[in-house]
């Protein structure tokens, strides 16, 4: 069976939205959501309103910058009393902790995973020291203003992040524009657009499989192996993996993060045009046309010598999604004799969605680390 197909969490498309552009978030439930957004909102809708400029306002330039530090909050409790092996006997081929009591063999030497003679000692921080301090840098600059009949806002945000897992990073760049215009006293328009570009490298896989670095790190790392030692000894002079045991049953976590990387990149465009016309008092005609489309590429590679994929392999995904939506709403509102209020609404919705997913996999690589199909 294939033990390498671990799922990688790439988040969801809500994470593309730039928080610096958000004015408000409202949750609609029940009939109100369905009336405004149709069958797609039968279970409710989250409405995100983005920032815009103000009419009759001077031009303002706003700069925001923030830095965040991230560390692993909680790790499992590990025993540091027994060495690897079974039935109280040391065995370098076994990665579990049922070997001899470490304190009882301090005067003896044993063969480690590299074949060296060593004295056994516990390393209480060998999992903790694998992780690094993650850092995030978020910078935003926006320009906003408006005149008597128009307003505008431009914004650019960069997000650059290094993760707690060594070799992992995430970068996102978002540009947005929001502009409105009063063409006449009863005819207005607004246009908004966002472009998002993001890429990441080194996202860890999940699940009980060989591509998940937590399997060798938490389940397979004996307490007597120093994490700093395997960091320096994950690959030999011939480019082959130095596994955690001489029989090659468990990947070295540093082999996974250096050789078996998952990468992805995304380009997304969101645009809306809203026109509102009030021909007579109480009658409002609004048309909102919008599109949302993105392309995303993902790639997961396994170098030759990886446990579970000894001959190497790689897999790619090319995703494309496009949504076109148009809402036409006509409403009429009138109060009679100060006692009776009449309100009517009629609308039409056009919704079109296109989705493509191309998934290709190659195994038994002829040339190591040549991850192309041609």
Which residue stretches match the model-derived regions?
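Outer-membrane beta-barrel channels and translocator barrels
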Residues: 19, 136, 147-148, 184, ...
């Amino acid at each position: 069976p294939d033990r390498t197909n671990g799922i990688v969490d790439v988040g969801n498309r809500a994470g593309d939205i730039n928080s610096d552009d958000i004015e408000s978030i409202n949750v609609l439930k029940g009939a109100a959501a369905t009336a405004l957004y149709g069958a797609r909102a039968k279970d409710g809708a989250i409405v995100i309103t983005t920032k815009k400029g103000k009419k009759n306002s001077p031009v303002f330039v706003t700069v925001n910058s923030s830095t965040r530090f991230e560390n692993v909050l909680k790790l499992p409790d590990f025993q540091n009393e027994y060495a690897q092996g079974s039935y109280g006997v040391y065995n370098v081929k076994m990665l579990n902790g049922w070997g001899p009591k470490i304190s009882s063999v301090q005067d003896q030497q044993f063969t480690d995973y590299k074949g060296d003679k060593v004295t056994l000692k516990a390393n209480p921080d060998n999992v903790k020291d694998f992780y690094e301090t993650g850092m995030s840098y978020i910078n935003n600059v926006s320009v906003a203003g408006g005149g008597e009949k128009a307003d505008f806002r431009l914004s650019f945000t960069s997000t650059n992040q290094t993760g707690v897992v060594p070799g992992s990073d995430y970068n996102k760049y978002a540009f947005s524009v929001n502009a409105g215009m009063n063409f006449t006293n009863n005819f207005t328009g607004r246009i908004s657009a966002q472009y998002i570009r993001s890429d990441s490298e080194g996202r860890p896989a999940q699940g009980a499989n060989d591509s998940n670095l937590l399997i060798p790190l938490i389940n397979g790392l004996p307490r007597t192996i120093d994490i700093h030692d395997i960091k320096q000894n994950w690959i030999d002079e011939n480019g082959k993996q130095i596994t955690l045991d001489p029989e090659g049953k468990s990947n070295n976590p540093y082999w996974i993060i250096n050789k078996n990387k998952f990468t992805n990149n995304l380009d997304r465009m969101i645009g809306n045009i809203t026109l509102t016309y009030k021909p007579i008092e109480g009658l409002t005609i609004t048309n909102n046309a919008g599109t949302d489309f993105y392309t995303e590429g993902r790639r997961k590679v396994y170098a030759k010598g990886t446990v579970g994929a000894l001959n190497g392999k790689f897999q790619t995904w090319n995703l494309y999604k496009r949504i076109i939506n148009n809402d036409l709403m006509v409403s009429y509102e009138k109060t009679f004799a100060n006692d009776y209020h009449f309100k009517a609404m009629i609308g039409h919705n056009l919704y079109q969605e296109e989705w493509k997913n191309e998934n290709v996999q190659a195994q038994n690589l002829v040339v190591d680390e040549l991850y192309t199909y041609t």
